[in-house]
Amino acid sequence: MTRIRPYQPDDLDGMLGVQNASADAEAGQSGASRSGLASYWGLRDRRRPAGLWVAEEGGQIVAYAGLRPWHSLGWLQAEVVVHPAERGRGVGGALLRHLVRAARRRSTAYLCAITPDAHPDRGTYLEHHGFQPFVRRQHMRLEPVVAPAAADVPGFAVRAAGPADCGALARINNASYPAGDRVGRADAAGYQRFIEASGAQVWVAEQVPAGPVVGLCEVRQAEVALNGAPVRTGHIGSLAVLPAYRQRGLGRRLLVRGIELCRENGWPTVELNVDRDNEPALHLYESTGFRAVYAFTVYRLALAAGPLAP
């Protein structure tokens, strides 16, 4: 009989086995290392995190699920990982219902879930449980990490961001998603918390000599397992330029600086995600050497409306 219970510190190795068995079955997916999985779920110092559960059968972990912060207050991301040998037995559904109940107790407005398009049955499954397609994205990779040439843009400088720039970073974020529907309305304090929590390095494009800051590139470290060993990689989480300053080469200049930063850190690959209907961004990334790895869809459940299907 399968039992769902909160995560305990000794569960990490069992979770890792489930994670890597699942990755082996997925096209384009990378395995995890022990340290990478612990970092991803905030399991340092053997703490028990809120929002992480395992499914256990016969003393073995066969699946796990957790809630992670999304990009704005009131949103959470649901992740359910089931060992391939255990799929189709209802374990994933039981964990998903558990996550929805936990998210509702936290007064969450929206719960998101990500599924690769190579497995359309999972999207159908999420829709059965009340989720709806939200945004369709492409995962891209640059390997080896070679930064192409990018000329400086006259009248603008690219520099590392500091705490005083967080208000400008929030304004750029909000201008990139004016309806606030995708990532919510950012503010300076929220952006500062994000940088501190993620360890991101942010570079900005600033009009000289007196401003304003008009673009940003956010780079952070990720970790995958290659041949069973943890390998650090670069991840470009956000690249944005204020609408009035586009078509000047600032986006390319910021992207190249982000790639250079990844190379300086010795990361063997750079990864990013982009909306599939964002043709200018797709062209920019392809022109700098990024190649498509896999497509995925983000689904969203509005928790204030409708129960989870049984």
Can you say where each PLM-predicted feature lies in the sequence?
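Conserved donor-binding loop and adjoining core beta-sheet/short helix segment
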Residues: 9-12, 19-106, 115-116, 214-232
